[in-house]
Amino acid sequence: MKKIILSAVALLSLLALFGCNNRAEVQALQPASYAELTPMQQSWRGVLPCADCAGIETSLFLEKDGTWVMNERYQGAKVPTVIASWGTWARTADKLVLTDSDGEKRYFHARGEQLEMLDSEGKAISSSFNYTLSPVKASLPTTPIAMKGMYFYMAEAAVFTDCATGRRFAVSSNAQLERDYAAARDGEQKPVLLVAQAHFSLEPNPESGAMQKTLVVGSHSRFESNKDCRD
């Protein structure tokens, strides 16, 4: 009986370690904590197969706040194309699940120190081509990402709340953006919808000095007064 109990405890501990439970996958997905991420690299790069180009140079960055950024450069394309995307990530027992800002999912599987891309249903791809990303040390990409959210500025600090995910980010200091916001809010101290081309960066927190994920808003951005995320 003692052996049975010990075996049961060991099994439960193993299941807890890998985040397994008997719910459906959608219910099981939770933003992973930093402790869960520790055994994995935080950034990867590789060239993934492409149907109509030489390959897709792919860089993936996982952040401790449960978000990710991906940069994809299409090699040998007739028109140079670079696409940046972002969203939230979560772990299941055997998969890394990336959900982008439009709700679309991409799946990867940890194989040693590498990440192996899975198909659209989260299953292994049977192919002679290389679908793996290798660990690297790299900075966040500066390729602009189309974003929409509520911008609020007060006490010399700006915050952007993304419409698609509800995530909040500090905004890098931008005098022109602050002037545009002042004009758009029409004298009221309120959030205003911002449609932006932006990228993420790591910048020191003005108060603590600790590095934090910050949104850098580009010049091709605009405020839309009297609108919100529902519009």
Residues covered by each model-derived region:
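Bacterial N-terminal signal peptides that target proteins for export
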Residues: 1-8
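Core hydrophobic alpha-helical transmembrane segments of single-pass membrane proteins
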Residues: 10-12
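Bacterial Sec-type N-terminal signal peptides, specifically the leucine/valine-rich hydrophobic h-region
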Residues: 14-17
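Lipid interaction determinants
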Residues: 20-84, 98-154, 163-170, 189, ...
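Beta-strand/loop nucleic-acid-binding surfaces
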Residues: 167-185
